[in-house]
Amino acid sequence: MKKKNLLAALLAGSLALSLTACSSDTAPEGDPQAGGEGSDPFQVSMILKTNSSEFWRLIQAGAEAYEKEHPDLVKLSIKGPPSETSYEEQLNMIQTDLGTAEFDGYLIAPLQSDAVANQIANTDKPVMAFDTRIESDKCLSFIGTGNKEAAKQGAKAAVEAAKAAGWEKIQCIEIAGVQGDATNTARMDGYREGINEAGGEFLDNEVQYANATADLAVTAMEGIMGKFPDGVAIICSNNDDMAIAAASTAKKNPAYANTIFLGFDGQLSACEAIANGELTMSAAQNNYDIGYKAVEEMVRVLQGGEPKDFVDTGTEIVTKDNANERIERMSGYLK
């Protein structure tokens, strides 16, 4: 019997009861191996925010690792637009796949959560969000990092590092991502709370939006140095690429010699920069696990398991003390 027929039989009643937004209660796990033999694998659409960066390649590597380990359970169709501002292209990809009858479920990392929520409003197939939440009663689960909490942990670590570096006035300016993006907002909220709770001051009026790109982060950092010629204790960024760009831009400015540059993601290039003393720290996501666990959770629910509200893939604060260990681990994932 095809697995999609199994899905229809098992989920006809349970989906109606469990489609309670991405905030439903955690429920017992199903057996991830059930129904694997003698039936076709589930067809799952997985749409990334982009497929042009290391961060998303690691997520894809994790997803493909699960697929490779369980070829009888799932077959993936993974795609993504060229950049994290390619909104229309991603929406078109999602719309196309929603209209494709062969897919049994959809894993989506939305660039625009509200727009995607509207797109999935009429689907009767399982939808799960990864990396960024989709606020919709059709979204069964969120798989990823608690962005606010991870940023908060990183911010508190940055304040302690700034104190150790000799800063008395601990102010923080953020070089932010895309204004209005849910992930960017969550990270900013976490940075603000972490800095302020640890005794620093998050300068809300000085936030610089850089659309999650290194080029605009350079421009933002140049503006910060012009406005704050005596230096700033902490520069936090929405992602590692921007943090590396900001640190590089300030490298020859003696007023910023002891500035703590905090990134987010913990990607390989950032870990190498931290190990080499070119970046101070990063609030690292376990992005390989995001991909792996997203597919794992989708398969479990397609087999009749109750969806979990949140599958937390964890956070790691990367500093010079543990950067090399993470480099070795991540390099292995990309082989």
Give names to the regions the model predicted.
Residues 1-43, 68, 121-125, 333-335:
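Short, low-complexity disordered leader/linker segments with a strong preference
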